[in-house]
């Protein structure tokens, strides 16, 4: 989809250009295919309602362990997905189809995408036309894998960079005429902190060019690994699964000055024990901010001289990492300390999870028939 075609179609009525007559109705879909969690959307909410119709599903497929007895798994299923897989993980071999936002297991990805389609189109009586978010600088191999998997499930596919879709999802079209409204699509710098990567994107009203995009392989998963290492260094007798480490991070994450008083219960040789992890959580999360700030400087330096000062006033943090306490304030403080003039860093929304899918659905509703990959 070209820059011009996206701009032209997004601002049109949802009907767009007349599509060829088909026996099936069209079902536009927006999909955020995440490393840990995905969101699929078939209906837009009323602007400003604060609600969304997205279906959130953990990105995981479960295969039964060899020799599993009948009646152990629901419906004696040969494969489970999402929450069903996690609820029965004791009896399953869990496979995450994606790593760092890129498909690693093509068959698991196809199965998972098929499961997502069933959630919004269980009878498959419609032509499902799906726009899917991709990492900011996904290479050709990553795009080809995703396209192959998606085309095996959906009737039409479009792949669009995730930060652009997040900006579009955040945009409130009803407020565009308000003088104080900062349009996230007009001139902004989006920072999308995911599990596998952190993506940066300059958005200036059109489809981003390659030079407007940057992606680093550092996100929530790296924070988990660092936190695990720090806990092991301080408590050698403690051996925790990464899922438990991730749970501590998600509950207690913060950046800035070290905090104490974060005590958690862990098993040591089967016995309960409480340990203090406040300093370790802060150090792990601050490492993420170090990486983000260094990359932000690189992206800001690439912005055009006529746009950079207003761009600095519209830096938006989204993705799972946006839930880290004080992350927007800490990044803004570091930019000020480095000499940037009046930067303004803010969080996208209280609930970031549907933004990419909302933006994807807006594109899907506006796309012309000849723009879909079949």
Give, region by region, the residue ranges found by the protein language model.
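N-terminal low-complexity or amphipathic/hydrophobic leaders
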Residues: 59-64, 70
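C-terminal, charged low-complexity interaction regions
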Residues: 193-195
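A structural feature that tracks compact, well-ordered secondary-structure segments
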Residues: 199-201
């Amino acid at each position: 989809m070209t820059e011009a075609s996206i701009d032209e179609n997004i601002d049109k009525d949802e009907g767009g250009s007349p599509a060829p007559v088909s026996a099936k109705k069209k079902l536009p879909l927006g999909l955020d295919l995440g490393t840990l969690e995905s969101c699929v959307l078939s209906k837009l909410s009323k602007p400003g309602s604060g609600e969304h119709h997205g279906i959130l599903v953990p990105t995981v497929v479960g295969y039964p362990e060899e020799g599993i007895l009948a009646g152990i798994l629901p419906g004696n299923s040969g494969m489970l997905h999402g929450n069903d897989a996690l609820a029965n993980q004791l009896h399953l071999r869990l496979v995450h189809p994606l790593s760092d936002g890129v498909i690693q297991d093509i068959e698991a990805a196809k199965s998972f995408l098929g499961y997502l389609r069933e959630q919004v189109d269980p009878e498959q009586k419609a032509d499902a036309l799906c726009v899917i978010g991709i990492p900011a600088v996904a290479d050709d191999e990553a795009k080809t894998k995703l396209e192959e998997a998606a085309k095996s499930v959906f009737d039409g596919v479009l792949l669009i960079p995730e930060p652009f879709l997040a900006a579009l999802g955040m945009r409130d079209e009803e407020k565009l005429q308000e003088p104080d409204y900062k349009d996230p699509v007009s001139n902004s710098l989006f920072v999308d902190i995911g599990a596998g990567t952190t993506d940066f994107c300059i958005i200036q009203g059109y489809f981003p060019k390659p030079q407007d995009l940057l992606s680093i392989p550092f996100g929530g998963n790296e924070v988990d690994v660092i936190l695990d290492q720090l806990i092991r260094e301080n408590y050698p007798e403690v051996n925790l699964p990464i899922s438990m480490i991730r749970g501590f991070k998600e509950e207690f994450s913060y950046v800035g000055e070290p905090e104490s008083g974060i005590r958690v219960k862990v098993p040591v040789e089967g016995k309960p024990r409480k340990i203090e992890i406040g300093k370790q959580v802060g150090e792990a999360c601050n490492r993420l901010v170090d990486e983000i700030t260094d990359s932000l400087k690189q992206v800001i330096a690439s912005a055009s001289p006529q746009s950079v000062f207003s761009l600095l006033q519209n830096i938006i943090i989204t993705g799972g990492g946006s839930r880290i306490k004080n992350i927007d304030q800490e990044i803004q403080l570091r930019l000020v300390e480095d000499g940037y003039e009046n930067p303004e860093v803010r969080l996208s929304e209280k609930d970031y999870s549907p933004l990419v899918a909302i933006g994807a659905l807006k594109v899907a509703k506006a796309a012309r028939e000849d723009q879909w990959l079949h």
